[in-house]
Amino acid sequence: MTVDYLRDPKSIYRQSFATIRKEADLSKLPEDIADVVVRLIHACGMTDIVEDLVFSKDVVRSGREALQQGAPVLCDARMVAEGVIRSLLPAENEVLCWNSHPECPVMAKKMETTRSAAAVEFWRPQLVGAVVAVGNAPTTLFRLLEVIAEGVGPPAVILGFPVGFVGAVESKELLIKQCGIQNQRVELGKTVPFLTLSGRRGGSAMAAAVVNALAKTTKT
């Protein structure tokens, strides 16, 4: 049996991005944000996420500069870390996830929290100037914001895409409140440039896609 379908990788990408730009309303987004959002939509298949995006307008510039300077990428889940394309990273940046570290369960038990939240404690030495990608656990984002409020860090950018029915909405609302203003188009974050998707939607693929988009724009 022969099935007629598009096989050429470059043609598939080209057609995909053309479809996204046709179907998604990117007209109100700054050009650098729009380019990242195209990659984000490509990862999730949902063009309607544009209306739920909240960001500080310096997030792309800050993320690019951080990666160029060799900043580590701190991930809340292995799925996020595995989704980051190493060959795109401009400075052989480390991609780190501490959830599987043998000391993480001990820390989680001590703190009476999730492993994902406890893993943030291991980020502390590398948090300043890092690119943080949260694509799974709301507890990670909550704890990160607590740590930043304590005066630790801050990272260069926060990519906040926790997903789910418990804590995802609230953690992203706190991110917006703490790092910007409660407005869909934030001029400048008060503390840390960020990009997030309000509501329950998110996921590892989204978080990794944004890291890849930032990295791709820096690759010469």
Specify the residue positions occupied by each region the protein language model found.
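N-terminal glycine-rich anion-binding loops that anchor highly charged ligand groups
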Residues: 28-42
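Short glycine/serine/threonine-rich phosphate/pyrophosphate-binding segments
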Residues: 80-83, 139-144, 165-169, 203-207
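Charged, compositionally biased N-terminal leader segments and the immediate start
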Residues: 1-31
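Long, charge-dense
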Residues: 89-130
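A short, well-structured juxtamembrane/interface segment
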Residues: 51-66
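Feature captures the catalytic cores and cofactor-binding loops of soluble hydro-lyases/lyases
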Residues: 126, 140-158, 167-170, 176-177, ...
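C-terminal functional extensions of proteins
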Residues: 166-220
